[in-house]
Amino acid sequence: MARVTVQDAVEKIGNRFDLVLVAARRARQIQSGGKDALVPEENDKVTVIALREIEEGLITNQILDVRERQEQQAAEIQAVTAIAEGRR
């Protein structure tokens, strides 16, 4: 299990307050959103996994925003397609 230093993660995000927000958001995605971890889990808790992803530069607030926007657009397209097919 690799040791996570918060300072390395802070340097990737900018400040510790934003780090807490991004790490919590990502940990929730992994825990309940069905998102897969981008780093080996190694029996770590989701918060540690989120910090490791941030530390490695795999996750930022902008990346999370883009992913959520893409998922929302895909869901909207799917809903519109289902409605259009129902009218035929």
From Swiss-Prot:
Record keywords, A-Z: DNA-directed RNA polymerase, Nucleotidyltransferase, Transcription, Transferase
Catalyses which reaction(s): RNA(n) + a ribonucleoside 5'-triphosphate = RNA(n+1) + diphosphate
Recorded coiled-coil stretches: none
Molecular-function GO term, any one: DNA binding
UniProt entry tagged with the keyword Transcription: yes
EC category name: transferase
An annotated GO BP: DNA-templated transcription
Pfam families: RNA_pol_Rpb6 (PF01192)
This enzyme's EC code(s): 2.7.7.6
Keyword Transcription among UniProt keywords: yes
Source organism, top-level taxon: Bacteria
GO cellular component: DNA-directed RNA polymerase complex
SUPFAM superfamilies tied to this protein: RPB6/omega subunit-like (SSF63562)
Subunit structure, as described in the record: The RNAP catalytic core consists of 2 alpha, 1 beta, 1 beta' and 1 omega subunit. When a sigma factor is associated with the core the holoenzyme is formed, which can initiate transcription.
Family stated for the protein in its record: Belongs to the RNA polymerase subunit omega family.
Function: Promotes RNA polymerase assembly. Latches the N- and C-terminal regions of the beta' subunit thereby facilitating its interaction with the beta and alpha subunits.
HAMAP family from the UniProt entry: RNApol_bact_RpoZ (MF_00366)
Name listed for the protein in its UniProt record: DNA-directed RNA polymerase subunit omega
